């Protein structure tokens, strides 16, 4: 415990300590009954109720244990004495005892004092152990001021910190705005082809429905009741229910009744090499104008026309 107090006083730059290290450690090693060793810490100036006060602390090592008188007092070095507040002895790790005394006076009262000395001994009149005089006034004073002093560069540091905070706030605000704008943008602007391919996409045209080539060869279901069953409607249903813009669907002319003596011959349709499907005209025709209407598929009509015999009239073109 004594060594820690000595190190603290050395760090504070105590001017009242002896210069020899052996004298510093000797009282602590002697134990009980050895000579007390006082030391003064540099005075500290405090501001109390608008007035300056000077605080001086005296540390005494290797004092008598509790129950034995060991007073501590301060003087100006001329025989005067000032009572100080003394704390009770506290045990140290090496078995010795330590006491602490403090003196607190206004700076005006201590202004008349040039030096200050701390004493300890069996009685107040016995100056058995004393510290070296501590200078309180003049240029050589080692008093320290604990007032709040303005630090240099504080205002510039505050301005830099404020500018950095403002820059970080602007970057965060820009990031939030960009994120919100991207979330509210259409799918095409975000580069999402899956969302932009829907039928409600405003920036892409609607896909055209292309009729399948084999839809003309497949039989179609009968029309519902109450709907028109004309050739134009059948063709529209066969092509998916839609017609191109500007196109008109016209019905095929009705077939005349066939005479028994004169056979009607039509030219055999040829297959288009560019089209893999053999298209043989409209899928639905009226066979008789006076008889009931019936529908034949394209493949049945082509087979019927191909099986007809050649015409007997030589005036028929192509006969």
Swiss-Prot record:
Residue ranges, Cytoplasmic side: 182-319
Membrane topology, Extracellular segments: 17-160
One of the protein's GO biological processes: negative regulation of thymocyte apoptotic process
Primary localization class, coarse: membrane
Glycosylated sites: 78
Residues annotated as signal peptide: 1-16
Region called Disordered, residue ranges: 189-293
Basic residues composition-biased segments: 260-271
Record's bilayer topology term: Single-pass type I membrane protein
Disulfide pattern: 58-118
Cellular component, GO, one term: plasma membrane
Compositionally biased region (Low complexity): 189-207
Keyword Magnesium: no
Keyword annotations of the record: Cell membrane, Disulfide bond, Glycoprotein, Membrane, Receptor, Signal, Transmembrane, Transmembrane helix
Entry-linked InterPro entries: Ig-like_dom_sf, Ig-like_fold, PTCRA
Localization per Swiss-Prot or TrEMBL: Membrane; Cell membrane
Cited Pfam families: PTCRA (PF15028)
Transmembrane domains' residue ranges: 161-181
Function: Component of the pre-T-cell receptor complex (composed of PTCRA, TCRB and the CD3 complex) that has a crucial role in early T-cell development, particularly alpha-beta T cell differentiation.
Subunit structure: Heterodimer with TCRB; disulfide linked. This heterodimer assembles with CD3 proteins into a signaling-competent pre-T-cell receptor complex. Interacts with RHBDD1.
This protein's name: Pre T-cell antigen receptor alpha
Organism: Bos taurus
Gene expressing this chain: PTCRA
């Amino acid at each position: 415990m004594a060594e820690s107090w000595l190190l603290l006083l050395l760090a504070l730059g105590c001017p009242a300590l002896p210069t020899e290290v052996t004298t510093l450690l000797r009282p602590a090693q002697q134990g009980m009954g050895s000579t007390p060793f006082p030391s003064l810490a540099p005075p500290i100036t405090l501001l109390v109720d608008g007035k300056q006060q000077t605080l001086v602390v005296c540390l005494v090592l290797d004092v008598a244990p509790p129950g034995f008188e060991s007073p501590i007092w301060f003087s100006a070095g001329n025989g005067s004495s000032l009572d100080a507040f003394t704390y009770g002895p506290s045990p140290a790790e090496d078995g010795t005892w330590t006491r602490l005394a403090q003196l607190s006076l206004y700076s005006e009262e201590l202004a008349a004092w040039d030096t200050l000395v701390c004493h300890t001994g069996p009685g107040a009149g016995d100056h058995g152990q004393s510290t070296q005089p501590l200078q309180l006034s003049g240029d050589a004073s080692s008093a320290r001021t604990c007032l709040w002093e303005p630090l240099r560069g504080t205002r510039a540091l505050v301005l830099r910190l404020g500018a950095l905070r403002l820059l970080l706030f602007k970057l965060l605000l820009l990031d939030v705005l960009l994120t919100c704008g991207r979330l509210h943008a259409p799918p095409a602007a975000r580069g999402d082809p899956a969302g932009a391919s829907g039928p409600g996409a405003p920036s892409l045209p609607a896909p055209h429905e292309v009729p399948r080539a084999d839809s003309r060869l497949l039989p179609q279901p009968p029309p519902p009741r109450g709907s028109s069953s004309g050739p134009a409607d059948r063709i529209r249903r066969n092509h998916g229910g839609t017609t191109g813009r500007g196109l008109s669907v016209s019905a095929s002319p009705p077939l005349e009744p066939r005479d028994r003596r004169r056979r009607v011959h039509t030219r055999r349709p040829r297959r288009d090499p560019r089209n893999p499907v053999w298209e043989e005209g409209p899928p639905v025709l009226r066979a008789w104008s006076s008889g009931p209407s019936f529908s034949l598929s394209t493949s049945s009509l082509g087979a019927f026309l191909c099986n007809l015999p050649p015409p007997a009239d030589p005036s028929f073109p192509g006969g």
